[in-house]
Amino acid sequence: MACEIAADRVLAGRVSDNGEMVEMCASRELAPGSVVPDMIEANLRDRNSVYQTIRDSLASVGGRSRDVIAVLPDAAVRVALLGFDALPAKPDEAEAVVRFRLKKSLPFDVDKAKVSYHAQITGKGVRVVAAVVLSNVLEDYEAAFREAGYTPGVVLPSMLAALGAANAEQPTLVVKVDARTTSIAILDKNQLLLFRTLENSRGVTITGEQLAEEVYPSIVFFQDTYSLNLERIFIAGLPESGGAAPALQAQTGAEVRDLVSSSQLGMSTSPIPRWRMAGVVGALVS
């Protein structure tokens, strides 16, 4: 099972036995102000409400296990791509090198943070995808799951979780919008090449033209850096993702579609729209 805590709701899902689709899902709204995603300040302003909503959401998808993938808001986690010639073979030494590189780019003390990273070998060395969250922020989220009766064995920021739903063998842009952020990722051969999280003051009311304008600098940077053209674009988090298609197609010539496909969300009659479920679906089908 996977469960995402967003600013306005909790989403949960249970994967099918073959691991190819989410066969049950649930969504429960939170009272305004219950969760305020932030990298520094306390996120859970009404802990009782949050853990009760987690419990109700996961109970409704009916999983037998008490282990869950916890998906956190993107505004609470810093994700960075770092390049190295090489990393030390010992994990603790490698983490120390990653932490040192992160030090100057964070709005908080890296020594007070949890760091998780994945190293990708490239032709030029090592590319590291690092996720960083303040320890007290992470502990609050994990405690909410435990109070609800579940064990958060894996914890992911929403955008990194959502990437699990994308087939990115070809140059692929993934854009995910929420109430606080617009997250942009570009992948090729299922390797993450670019990752950015931008402040989003318009929330899900952002228009297709506005979204294309925000994304365009990242597209240009990718094309200039890698001499590749995007072939596919996936959108998540917008009720009318088709509204962004004409502007993005005009910029890139790439096909634009919803990130979560109908085949990945088995409950075709579910009242929960696919555009809300990217984090949960990606965490489970990756």
Where are these regions (language model features)?
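Hydrophobic/aromatic-enriched cytosolic interaction surfaces used to assemble or bind macromolecules
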Residues: M1-S286
